[in-house]
Amino acid sequence: MFTSIDDVQNKLSEKGYVCSRALATVVFLSLKLGRPLFLEGEAGVGKTEIAKAMAAVLGRKLIRLQCYEGLDASSAVYEWNFPAQMVAIRTAEAAGGSNKDALQTELFSDQYLIKRPLLEAMQPDENGAPILLIDELDRTDEPFEAFLLEALSDFQVTIPELGTIKAPEPPIVILTLSLIHI
């Protein structure tokens, strides 16, 4: 992590991102307090780039959730790999499989789960918690914003077939908003 506000400026500068002292202060405090970093501004001012630079400096994985109108929880958290599940069903049928309970348990396991950005950000990583960039939040609708608030308040999501998945270490969250969409 960063040791001071000057350290934020210096290390980000080494990665090609020059930031003001005010922005460096906000970044430093956000990390020290373990709170999300909320950045708003016009398109092209570097809101997304700071997340990339921070990931490079901190050696963390960057996970980006690009927001758009109509984005829903299933697109942001997870979905099931239906084609692979269908192949497994057909294979079990062809092999004369009769244990439907075992097949159902297998079909709704990690093997067939496609992790989307929010779920991916809650997975353990050897380099520490990832940086979760929620980009252009202003493009989403209120129901998704409410869902996101709930998911990020406890850093956990519930998948009905698997149960609740909680981040062992909360991700570093950066939210961006473009003034042009307000």
What are these regions (language model features)?
Residues 123, 144-166:
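Conserved catalytic/switch belt of AAA+ P-loop NTPases
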Residues 180-182:
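Conserved small/polar residues in nucleotide/adenosyl-binding loops
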Residues 134-140:
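Conserved Walker B
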Residues 133-134, 158-160, 172-177:
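Structural recognition of the conserved hydrophobic beta-strand(s) that form the central parallel beta-sheet
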Residues 38-70, 81-82:
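Walker A/P-loop
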Residues 2-23:
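Dynamic helix-loop-helix/coil hinge segments at AAA+ ATPase domain boundaries and subdomain interfaces
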Residues 28, 89-132:
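Conserved alpha-helical scaffold flanking the Walker A/P-loop in AAA+ ATPase domains
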Residues 19-21, 28-34, 125-127:
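Phosphate-binding P-loop
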